[in-house]
Amino acid sequence: MAISPEFLTSTLGFTVGDGDTALAVGSGSLPVLGTPRLLAWMEAATCAALEPVLQEGSTSVGTRVQVEHLGASPVGAGVEVSASSAYDDGRLHRFTVSARDTATGKVLAAGEITRVVVDEERFMARTVG
């Protein structure tokens, strides 16, 4: 059963800390929000959007990411990340994601993240070598 796309939305707020910087996560040499951390925050928003509709024993896994990191955020900056369903077929969910600076409203990143709903046990059984 497909779920109404406008129902699957989530917005999360974060403050950039020292451990979130490109320098700290190894993706650069500057003390600004690192792209890997920003992407993790955006994925967390997609997970939060899907959580209320997942059946017991199910979870979702990321399968595709297309994100542009458009602006730098210093330590102490507030960042709001949002995910909104753009497409779903019951298993596959494509989200439009964005991040903005909470003080200025400036768009920091935008793109799409795709997740697929899977059975937790069956998925993990396939990962055993």
List where the protein language model places each region:
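Intrinsic-disorder/low-complexity, polar/charged segments enriched in Ser/Thr/Lys/Arg/Asp/Glu/Gln
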Residues: 5-11, 64, 78-80, 92-94
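HotDog/MaoC-like acyl-thioester-processing domains
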Residues: 7, 74-75, 85-129
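Generic structural detector for well-ordered beta-strands
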Residues: 13-17, 68, 114
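Hydrophobic beta-strand-centered segment that forms part of the acyl-chain substrate-binding groove
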Residues: 47-80
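Catalytic strand-loop segment that frames the active site of acyl-thioester-processing enzymes
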Residues: 1-34, 51
